């Protein structure tokens, strides 16, 4: 005999799990009114949905930043669609996870997943249950935490998918501090200053700069030789372009053959006679440019004229103030 499921029981289970009304009713019917079993059914449904949608992109969602007593956290909760991201239950879970992160201050995302929410569920369980409720993949896509004497935060109010927190060595004018947090959010620096950039990053940038400089010098000689031969370099800058432009009648078959020969012979000759000292000097300059554009202190302040370095903006507000640390979470990167 089928057990009668009362509306009050459905509401009770919904309050316990956060699942949808129909999912709660189905779980109670299947469990014959056993609440513990019904909760397990809902949890298993969430795991099943999560497994089926494991390869889905989660570029939508909510990013929440919170500050309290010299500590700050950012949590990014991702989902598949903007529709679900705006759902009240989804937004509430993002806030609840952020609160748990601020209270427990876990060391990393793995530790955050084991934290307990105010309703008694772990973060992992709550995310899985919401996955079952919405039918979309949900994931804690980002988590960052900092400690500092003074902290400012910025959350992008339009998209809700980006936030940054910045820690200073001392209290700073609120408007300036928030502006620096906005700088971090919008410009995504790699470090506070050049001294804080990891050597592996510098090595990779130098290597890239060397290869780019080599390619440019080789291409410069090739272009000069092509132009001297009466061939437009733009018409033969790739094999696809050579074939396409030949079919359009922009270059002849003879010019195509000649261009290929010039590209090969001139390119090989130049590559064998590159001035590596000059190339490395150019590469070093490019690394310095990278540091200026990608370290917070040296970046042009975007909330001002876009040219004045952030460090000068901070110094003008307080000569003793400086940035100690920053973190950023974005669902769109």
Which stretches of residues belong to each language-model region?
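N-terminal assembly/interaction segments in proteins that build large macromolecular machines
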Residues: 2-333
């Amino acid at each position: 005999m089928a057990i009668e499921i009362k509306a009050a029981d459905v509401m009770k289970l919904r309050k316990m799990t956060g699942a949808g009304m129909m999912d709660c009713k189905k779980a109670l019917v299947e469990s014959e009114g056993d609440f513990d079993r019904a909760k397990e059914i809902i949890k298993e449904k969430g795991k099943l949905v999560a497994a089926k949608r494991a390869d889905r992109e989660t570029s939508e969602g909510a990013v929440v930043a919170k500050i309290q007593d010299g500590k700050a956290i950012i949590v990014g909760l991702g989902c598949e669609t903007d529709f679900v991201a705006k759902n009240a239950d989804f937004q509430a879970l993002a806030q609840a996870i952020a609160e748990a992160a601020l209270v427990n201050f876990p060391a990393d995302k793995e530790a955050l997943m084991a934290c307990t929410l105010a309703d008694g569920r772990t973060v992992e369980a709550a995310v899985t249950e919401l996955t079952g409720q919405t039918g979309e993949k949900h994931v804690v896509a980002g988590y960052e935490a900092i400690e500092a004497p003074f902290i400012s935060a910025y959350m992008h109010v339009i998209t809700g998918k980006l936030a940054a927190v910045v820690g200073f060595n001392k209290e700073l004018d609120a408007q300036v501090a928030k502006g620096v947090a906005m700088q971090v959010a919008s410009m995504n620096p790699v470090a506070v200053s050049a001294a804080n950039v990891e050597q592996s990053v510098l090595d990779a940038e130098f290597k890239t700069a060397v290869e780019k400089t080599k390619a440019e010098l080789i291409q410069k000689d090739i272009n000069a030789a092509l132009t001297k031969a009466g061939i437009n370099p733009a018409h033969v800058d790739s094999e696809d372009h050579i074939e396409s432009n030949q079919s359009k009648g922009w270059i002849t078959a003879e010019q195509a053959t000649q261009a290929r020969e010039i590209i090969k012979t001139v390119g090989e000759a130049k590559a064998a006679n590159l001035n590596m000292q000059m190339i490395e000097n150019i590469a070093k300059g490019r690394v310095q440019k990278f540091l200026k554009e990608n370290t917070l202190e040296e970046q042009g302040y975007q909330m001002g004229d876009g040219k004045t370095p952030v460090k000068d903006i901070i110094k003008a507000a307080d000569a003793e103030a400086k940035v100690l640390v920053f973190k950023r979470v974005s669902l769109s990167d």
